[in-house]
């Protein structure tokens, strides 16, 4: 029984020693510089910013006021038509539910 206790004690001490060394190495790695994840995030944010700026420039170069007015006019006429037909449909449903001829 004494040898088993000694063996368990040595094993526990070995595990604790490895854990302490691993903790010191982790602290040294953190102190050396930014992590790989933060470097990747910075890189992706840079790419996203440049793509966003390029898209904004392209939009500003191709912006046509006449086309914008046509789109706004088409939108207003289509929404007016949808409003009319929605009103008709609502009246029909209400008349069916109330039983009015």
Swiss-Prot record:
Name the domain of life.
Eukaryota
Q: Which GO terms describe its cellular component?
A: chylomicron; intermediate-density lipoprotein particle; low-density lipoprotein particle; spherical high-density lipoprotein particle; very-low-density lipoprotein particle
Q: Can you say where in the cell this protein is located?
A: Secreted
Q: Where is this region: Lipid binding?
A: 66-74
Where is this protein primarily located?
Answer: secreted
Q: Which Gene3D superfamilies match?
A: Apolipoprotein C-II
Task: Output one GO MF annotation.
Answer: lipase inhibitor activity
Pfam families given for it?
Apo-CII (PF05355)
InterPro entries associated with the record: Apo-CII (IPR008019), ApoC-II_dom_sf (IPR023121)
Print the keywords alphabetically.
Chylomicron, Glycoprotein, HDL, LDL, Lipid degradation, Lipid metabolism, Lipid transport, Secreted, Sialic acid, Signal, Transport, VLDL
Instruction: Please report the propeptide residues according to the UniProt annotation.
Output: 23-28
Region: Lipoprotein lipase cofactor, residue numbers: 78-101
Q: Please list the GO biological process terms of this entry.
A: cholesterol efflux; chylomicron remnant clearance; chylomicron remodeling; high-density lipoprotein particle clearance; lipid catabolic process; negative regulation of cholesterol transport; negative regulation of lipid metabolic process; negative regulation of receptor-mediated endocytosis
Check the UniProt entry and state the signal peptide residues, or none. 1-22
Q: What job does the chain carry out?
A: Component of chylomicrons, very low-density lipoproteins (VLDL), low-density lipoproteins (LDL), and high-density lipoproteins (HDL) in plasma. Plays an important role in lipoprotein metabolism as an activator of lipoprotein lipase, the enzyme which hydrolyzes the triacylglycerols on chylomicrons and VLDL.
By sequence similarity, the record places it as follows:
Belongs to the apolipoprotein C2 family.
| Official protein name in the record | Apolipoprotein C-II
Question: Gene encoding it?
Answer: APOC2
